[in-house]
């Protein structure tokens, strides 16, 4: 197939520096060698914060989100003193599932008291339905994104310290939402849930914990969770720099683990999201995405099971396995040296090589498209495969 490439540069709009930017080690910081290409963005960030404030002030005041006909009540409390780099956010999904609303409401109330982080916002959403998949409906993802946006703007949350956890049906939700929204989370922990055949490759850059009682035999949860711990072991054996995980099949415990799983909270807190990992593995799940970390694909080609692998080494981006006709690569000065040419290769062939010109308009476009302070990019390369 003939290979062509397109380099997109947009210019207009003077802008300022992003808060909570992360270096390649996953910790908040900057790359002094490329600061010339990271001007102070507070004007753009301020515009974004204002837009979120306008859109979500009703949710902050009323403790309920609404998208279309769906409503998601949200409850939160704040623990500890706010760190200099912003609060953590723990999104904790309740049990229940295919039952009546009152039982799911009871499980939501129970979840509010289940875990106590030493620091951060502990937030429990009430699922939008009363179905077995109540936490990972196709409509759910947009609610989780809005929870994060609201928490960043109204509660001083650091978007690189957002954690996902859930028990029973909430654990079912974590199994699905952790990989398909992996670029949003700093770490995730699944408690007493069933994976329902989910693929795990997209967890490459997301620390992930699995908890299940050894006697939790309903739906073979104990056996399947042990199997999935083995799957993560195998993925990490093939890729030792990725797939940080820990699995616990708790001896003598059934579906209720008597609080043993609370150890997940300090474990997750050790990690901060790195929005710019050097290597990305992306497998589309039941809810398909157009963007993942610093990659973009044609929306019409985003189908369940489609794979994309890419990595950055110095100023070279290598595209590996790819089920798309084209790929968009979003870059900033924390990822590559923008003073030098950038190269994109695939199967040993150079698809693009050239010096990139940062675009203020692209920064704005990507920020308001992704609605994440870390995903405002000044440069983009699109290559056709």
Locate the predicted segments by residue.
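The feature captures the conserved acid-bearing segment of alpha/beta-hydrolase catalytic domains
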Residues: 187-269
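Primarily recognizes the serine-hydrolase "nucleophile elbow" in alpha/beta-hydrolase
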Residues: 160-204
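Alpha/beta-hydrolase-fold serine-hydrolase catalytic core, especially in secreted/extracellular enzymes
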Residues: 29-35, 73, 233-385
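Acidic beta-to-alpha connecting loop that harbors the catalytic carboxylate
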Residues: 96, 127-128, 214-217, 252-253, ...
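Bacterial N-terminal signal peptides
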Residues: 8-17
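Gly/Ser-rich "nucleophile elbow"/oxyanion-hole loop immediately N-terminal to the catalytic nucleophile
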Residues: 80-85, 132-168, 180, 184
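A domain-start/cap signature at the N-terminus of enzymes
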Residues: 22-88, 352, 357-378, 382-385
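Active-site machinery of serine-nucleophile hydrolases
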Residues: 86-152
């Amino acid at each position: 197939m003939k290979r062509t490439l397109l380099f997109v540069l947009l210019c207009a709009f003077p802008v300022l520096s992003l808060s909570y930017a992360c270096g390649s080690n996953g910790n908040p910081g900057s790359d002094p060698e490329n600061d010339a290409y990271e001007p102070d963005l507070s004007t753009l960030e301020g515009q974004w914060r204002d837009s979120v404030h306008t859109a979500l002030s009703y949710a902050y005041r009323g403790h309920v989100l609404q998208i279309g006909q769906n409503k998601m009540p949200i409850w939160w409390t704040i623990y500890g003193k706010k760190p200099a780099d912003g609060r953590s956010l723990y999104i904790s999904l309740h049990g229940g599932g295919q039952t009546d609303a009152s039982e799911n409401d009871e499980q939501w109330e129970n979840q509010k008291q289940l875990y106590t982080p030493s620091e951060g916002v502990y937030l429990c959403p009430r699922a939008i339905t009363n179905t077995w998949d109540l936490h990972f409906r196709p409509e759910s993802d947009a609610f989780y994104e809005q929870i994060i946006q609201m928490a960043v703007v109204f509660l001083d949350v650091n978007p690189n310290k957002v954690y996902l956890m859930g028990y029973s049906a909430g654990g079912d939700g974590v199994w699905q939402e952790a990989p398909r929204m992996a670029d949003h989370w700093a770490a995730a922990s699944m408690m007493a849930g069933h994976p329902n055949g989910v693929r795990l490759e997209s967890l490459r850059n997301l620390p992930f914990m699995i908890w299940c009682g050894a006697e939790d035999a309903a739906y073979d949860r104990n056996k399947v969770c042990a199997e999935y711990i083995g799957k993560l072991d195998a993925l990490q054996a093939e890729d030792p720099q990725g797939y940080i995980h820990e699995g616990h099949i708790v001896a003598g415990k059934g579906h209720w683990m008597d609080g043993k799983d609370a150890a997940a909270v300090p474990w997750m807190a050790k990690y901060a999201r790195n929005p710019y990992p050097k290597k990305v593995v992306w497998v589309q799940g039941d809810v398909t995405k157009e963007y993942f970390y610093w990659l973009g694909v044609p929306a019409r080609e985003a189908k369940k099971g489609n794979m994309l692998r890419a990595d950055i080494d110095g100023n070279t981006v290598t595209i590996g396995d790819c089920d798309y006709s084209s790929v968009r690569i979003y870059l900033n000065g924390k990822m590559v040296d923008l003073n030098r040419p950038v190269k994109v290769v695939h199967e040993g062939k150079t698809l693009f090589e050239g010096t990139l010109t940062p675009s203020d308009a692209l920064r704005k476009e990507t920020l308001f498209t992704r609605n994440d302070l870390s995903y405002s990019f000044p440069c983009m390369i699109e290559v056709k495969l």
